[in-house]
Amino acid sequence: MNQGKIITVSGPLVVASGMQEANIQDICRVGHLGLVGEIIEMRRDQASIQVYEETSGIGPGEPVVTTGCPLSVELGPGLISEMFDGIQRPLDRFQKATDSDFLIRGVAIPSLDRKAKWAFIPKLSVGQEVVAGDILGTVQETAVIEHRIMVPYKVSGTLVAIHAGDFTVTDTVYEIKQEDGSIYQGSLMQTWPVRQSRPVAQKLIPVEPLVTGQRVIDTFFPVTKGGAAAVPGPFGAGKTVVQHQIAKFANVDIVIYVGCGERGNEMTDVLNEFPELIDPNTGQSIMERTVLIANTSNMPVAAREASIYTGITIAEYFRDMGYSVAIMADSTSRWAEALREMSGRLQEMPGDEGYPAYLGSRIAEYYERAGRVRTLGSQEREGTITAIGAVSPPGGDISEPVTQNTLRIIKVFWGLDAPLAQRRHFPAINWLTSYSLYQDDVGSYIDRKQESNWSNKVTRAMAILQREASLEEIVRLVGLDSLSEQDRLTMAVARQIREDYLQQNAFDSVDTFTSFPKQEAMLTNILTFNEEASKALSLGAYFNEIMEGTAQVRDRIARSKFIPEENLEQIKGLTQKVTKEIHHVLAKGGI
């Protein structure tokens, strides 16, 4: 522990002298109020400290005391369904303790509730050899999440005591005799520094798709469990709604939602909606698997920078249990702006658009903590973290540094388009500019698992949309009637794909989520119509006759998005009806 005194205060940056025994990344208590801060630069005996609370009212001469510990999070039962701020202060208990709707400075409240008791069920017995990562026992944290208590990193030896029963997170639950003869006394809780990634046994290639229930994503631009994706787009294009939809319906075990510098109303929406929504995979409330980290735009800027790391560290903890985790960061641009502000106050040499030169490496550090891994421990298990970050480029200009540095790292780009959003086409993901480098892996995985030709259908559908884009300029110049019959069919089918398949209403109880079997049935119907109509044209039928003769079945295809999942056979039955009606047009002899 080292005590110095403040010599400079500049917004969230405080400079203290007499800190020669302090270390970089140490947590400090700043001023008489004891504000939480972190040392980010050392020069001789002077330490530059970024303070995670409002610094108004503190001045030179006030004390600064280091704790000797880096910024860490508490990991244990009580994380799920909880809402924290950027440095893991529990907002609900904070409000009750301070009787204030705003964060009172200098108040220290433990991240995990010290009074709550959890029923611990041992899985190992006394005398067994254990290594770091082994699961000692479980706590049923919510109806859907079994919290697995693991041996902490760098601890191994013989289990000499383990107790069943109800315990708080600080009670001693087990004892391990280590190789040096010392006894390690463990509780249900462990801590971990947020800027250090948790170790794994092996990194694996991600192949299993993350099913989001959003048709444009799952069909054309899938992300794998363990992948990394970015959602850049201008204001009002629907970034937050896309993130909310994935948080609600993705087929993962745990969701970590980080609201980083965005509007407080959006976090309020999450708090209001999530408890009422039912997870289609478990039948329980979505809050039963969700951790919320709220660092809204009116909270201290420095804490934004920490909130992303807090979220990914909690995600790694659940991954190490063997769970699949999705972390949503909304928005990484606000996080980068916090980096820029602190860099400016430190008088560092600016890079592009004033961002620090190390912006790219910081973004890479975050996304590289995602992935599919084999975890530590003698019991073999796999876990995944899927990182999905929203990016808010000013004016929708994706050539700005945050977007460009993000695109170098991630493998899935869901580019939101302002013209699509203005036409009320949501999700406004542009199918011509977006991409997924997992497309081939996911396609092969689905073809193998489903024994279908899914990847071929996706390729055909995308070819139709690309052909439509190439014909659009001709149509604008000389009109639709100037096109050949085949090209007019392509334009009609492309419109069907856009309006009846890609367009999705997030606020409709049925259309908000589409399972993979339903997606395949819907796409098959549209492609069958294209195939059969194309054959009919080659046999001499007229385009207008085909469109008139199939008007009823095309209308049913358009409405199939509103057919509930349990009536899937109704959608599948439309394939035969399409073929039958086109054959009927040919039989009438429209040649």
Curated annotation (Swiss-Prot):
Stated role: Produces ATP from ADP in the presence of a proton gradient across the membrane. The V-type alpha chain is a catalytic subunit.
GO cellular component: proton-transporting ATP synthase complex
Gene designation per UniProt: atpA
NCBIfam families per record: PRK04192.1
Family in the record: Belongs to the ATPase alpha/beta chains family.
Domain of life of the source: Bacteria
BP GO terms, sorted: proton motive force-driven plasma membrane ATP synthesis
Residues that bind ATP: G233, P234, F235, G236, A237, G238, K239, T240
Top-level EC class as recorded in UniProt: translocase
The name this protein goes by in its record: V-type ATP synthase alpha chain
Matches recorded under Pfam families: ATP-synt_ab (PF00006), ATP-synt_ab_N (PF02874), ATP-synt_ab_Xtn (PF16886), ATP-synt_VA_C (PF22919)
Transmembrane intervals: none
Species the sequence originates in: Streptococcus pyogenes serotype M3 (strain ATCC BAA-595 / MGAS315)
Record keywords, A-Z: ATP synthesis, ATP-binding, Hydrogen ion transport, Ion transport, Nucleotide-binding, Translocase, Transport
Catalytic activity: ATP + H2O + 4 H(+)(in) = ADP + phosphate + 5 H(+)(out)
Matches recorded under PANTHER family: H(+)-TRANSPORTING TWO-SECTOR ATPASE (PTHR43607:SF1), V-TYPE PROTON ATPASE CATALYTIC SUBUNIT A (PTHR43607)
Biological classification of the source: Bacteria, Bacillati, Bacillota, Bacilli, Lactobacillales
GO terms of molecular function: ATP binding; proton-transporting ATP synthase activity, rotational mechanism; proton-transporting ATPase activity, rotational mechanism
This enzyme's EC code(s): 7.1.2.2
